[in-house]
Amino acid sequence: MDLDFHIKPEIRVLGIDDSALLNEKVMIVGTVFRGGDWMDGVLRSEITRDGLDATEVISTMIKNSRHYAQLRIVMLDGVTYGGFNVVDIEELYRETGLPVIVVMRAYPDFEKIRAALRHFSDGELRWEIIKKAGKIEKLVTEKNGTPIYIQKAGIGLKSAEKIVRLTSIRSNIPEPLRVAHLIATGIIFGESRGRA
């Protein structure tokens, strides 16, 4: 059931992004923000490149964090991490009790994704997890009108849109995701690069 609820300006949001695919283990970084203005902490873990452990690793990282009790929302930069290690957002919501908002800069090319998944013996399972993430909604967060796309679990569309807009203060990407990306790439490459 997706709920809409009152959103405080300093709602605690955890944004998660992954690093570059350089090894079999891929670093994931989470940043804890109060709204879009204030970073309270950084979380780190590792997932398997092209594995199936992203949901479990992210859930464990969240539940073992000292920030867990204050967190109200988890934001993901897409549903695939470390190549095609797919996050089951419904399961992540059930495991953590925290609503999940997936943010994407571009609408996914499902044809290309399906083609890539044909190279995996369990490609059909991964495809089902991707489909299970639900309807993709278009959202404009900034004045220039550049849209982003979101999916959600455990939260109503109005609340999800409000939280994304509240936390998108520097660009059309929410600060928790933008900063997680900067940290993840900076640690791996010695300097941040690319866009969240």
UniProtKB/Swiss-Prot annotation:
Top-rank lineage group of the source organism: Archaea
* Transmembrane regions listed in the UniProt entry: none
Q: Sorted alphabetically, which Gene3D superfamilies does this protein's record hold?
A: archaeoglobus fulgidus dsm 4304 superfamily
Cross-referenced Pfam families: DUF99 (PF01949)
Which residue spans adopt a coiled-coil conformation according to this UniProt entry?
none
> HAMAP family this protein is in?
UPF0215
Show the PANTHER family listed in the entry.
UPF0215 PROTEIN MJ1150
Family under the similarity heading: Belongs to the UPF0215 family.
- Its protein name is UPF0215 protein MA_4269
Please name the source species. Answer: Methanosarcina acetivorans (strain ATCC 35395 / DSM 2834 / JCM 12185 / C2A)
